[in-house]
Curated annotation (Swiss-Prot):
This is Pre-mRNA-splicing factor 38. Present with 2380 molecules/cell in log phase SD medium. Keywords: mRNA processing, mRNA splicing, Nucleus, Ribonucleoprotein, Spliceosome. It is found in: Nucleus. Its main location: nucleus. Residues 217-242 are annotated as: Disordered. InterPro entries: PRP38. Required for pre-mRNA splicing and maintenance of stable U6 small nuclear RNA levels. Implicated in the formation of stable and biologically active snRNP structures. As part of the U4/U6.U5 tri-snRNP particle, dispensible for spliceosome assembly, but required for conformational changes, which result in U4 snRNA release and the subsequent catalytic activation of the spliceosome. Belongs to the PRP38 family. One of its GO terms (cellular component) is precatalytic spliceosome. One of its GO terms (biological process) is spliceosome conformational change to release U4 (or U4atac) and U1 (or U11).
Length: 242
């Protein structure tokens, strides 16, 4: 028997959802590429984060994806679907933020010129990828029902917004050696529509999902109106990213 016939993967998170490690929503080959990337090793390893916590990861997220209104481009020129994006998405999956943390980040108010639109996009992709299996059938599970309500409200809310984001084409895997696609500008409602209707994004499979059916529901519309009243200024932020 070959010595290497059975290999234990060292980068599997011990945290679980849906009776398996949270890491397994990302295919093994993609996980290996992410964990072997220089960006992950320098910025997102347990040692570099100085604590494998959401508080430490949030510092990286703000530095990587925070934008300043009135400036062209975001601070470190990261894009949706790129290597750095996938690395942070992977770390977010491994840490598995709780409901209170997700609720806070998805409803944070932009102040002093800071714009969280790339962070919002990251969290929407994370929710669709990590929590695809939620179905709401367990009426006694308040945590599950709270997550479903939060995700549906946020998807519907941003399906009605149109701010621009720099991105790899949604069907393109940045790790593929054969791609010749250039970066593009997408609107947040396009990203939401993709998450609601497609089974993959940037080369990552999206599990079959029930709570992402948002277009025929009045609940999300009424729930999101009160939350989006203070966010209408985002719709005016339609200058192209450079």
């Amino acid at each position: 028997m070959a010595v290497n016939e059975f290999q234990v993967e060292s980068n599997i998170s011990p945290k679980q959802l849906n009776n398996q490690s949270v890491s397994l929503v990302i295919p093994r080959l993609t996980r290996d590429k992410i964990h072997n990337s220089m960006y992950y090793k320098v910025n997102l390893s347990n040692e570099s984060l100085r604590g494998n916590t959401m508080v430490e990861l949030l510092k990286v997220m703000i530095g990587a994806f925070g934008t300043i209104k009135g400036q062209n481009g975001h601070l470190h020129m990261m894009v949706l679907g790129g290597i750095e994006f996938k690395c942070i998405l992977m770390k977010l999956i491994e840490i598995r933020p709780n409901f209170q943390q997700l609720n806070f980040l998805l409803n944070v108010k932009n102040e002093n010129g800071f714009d969280s639109k790339y962070i919002i996009a990251l969290l929407l992709v994370y929710a669709r990828l990590q929590y695809y299996y939620l179905n709401g059938n367990n009426k006694n599970d308040d945590d599950e029902n709270d997550l479903i309500k939060l995700f549906k409200v946020q998807l519907y809310k941003y399906s009605q917004h149109y701010f621009k984001l720099k991105s790899f084409p949604l069907q393109v895997d940045c790790f593929a050696h054969s791609y010749n696609e250039e970066l593009c500008i997408i609107h947040i409602d396009e990203l939401v529509d993709w998450l609601a209707t497609q089974d993959h994004i940037w080369g990552i499979p999206l599990g079959k999902c029930q709570w992402n059916k948002i277009y025929n529901s009045d609940e999300e519309s009424s729930s999101s109106e009160s939350e989006s009243n203070g966010d209408s200024e985002d719709d005016n932020d339609t200058s192209s990213e450079s």
